[in-house]
Amino acid sequence: MLSRYIMERIVSDIPGMTISWNPKPFRQYNGSGCHTNFSTKEMRENDGYKHIIRSINLLSQRCANAQNDLYGVDNYLRTTVTHEAPSSKEFSYGVGTRHTSIRIGKQTSEDQKGYYEDRRPGANMNPYYVIAQLNNSTLH
């Protein structure tokens, strides 16, 4: 939020310059995502991989819809499976993938502990809402 404020202040002094937080301002290019890394203490401990998978399964049941405004207004324009974006119509996860809703890093898979990355949020998401969604979906 602070970096957005700083960028807006800098650009406000440049005539004719604007900032777009739209997650897909140009159809022919990759959109702008705000991939969000998530872990708990249990996930980072030895044998934490089972907690990662449990968390992802809970997430798939409770907030699988990437069109949710919590992930950013007009994010559906970015989540079309083209340009390495996850589908907004179906929840998926994988190790080292770039086209899934959730990506588990290769190192996390090898170590059997670590974190996962929610690839659904768009550039204009509210980070507080996204973290609250992850917490509420997986920790309760």
Where are these regions (language model features)?
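Active-site capping/gating regions of soluble enzymes
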Residues: 1-140
